[in-house]
Amino acid sequence: MANGTPAHELRELNAEELKTRLTEAKEELFNLRFQAATGQLTNNRRLRTVKRDIARIYTVIRERELGLSEVPGAEA
């Protein structure tokens, strides 16, 4: 996950899995920020990657709310 999670992979997840990924990413971002503040962070690039992953997850959730993308496994 050095380059983050591609949006097409996130679109294949259901709503519950997306929420789980979002929670995990937010926790990781919190820990990375804490490490940066204490001078223990060795990979500064990871901060940016995690922020972008969070934004991608929010984008996929919003696309589904607006009906721009379909929820996998949901038959119309």
Swiss-Prot record:
Q: Which PROSITE patterns match?
A: RIBOSOMAL_L29
Show the SUPFAM superfamilies listed in the entry: Ribosomal protein L29 (L29p) (SSF46561)
**Disulphide-bridged cysteine pairs:** none
GO function terms (MF aspect)? structural constituent of ribosome
Please list the GO biological process terms of this entry: translation
- Member of which family? Belongs to the universal ribosomal protein uL29 family.
Q: What is this protein called?
A: Large ribosomal subunit protein uL29
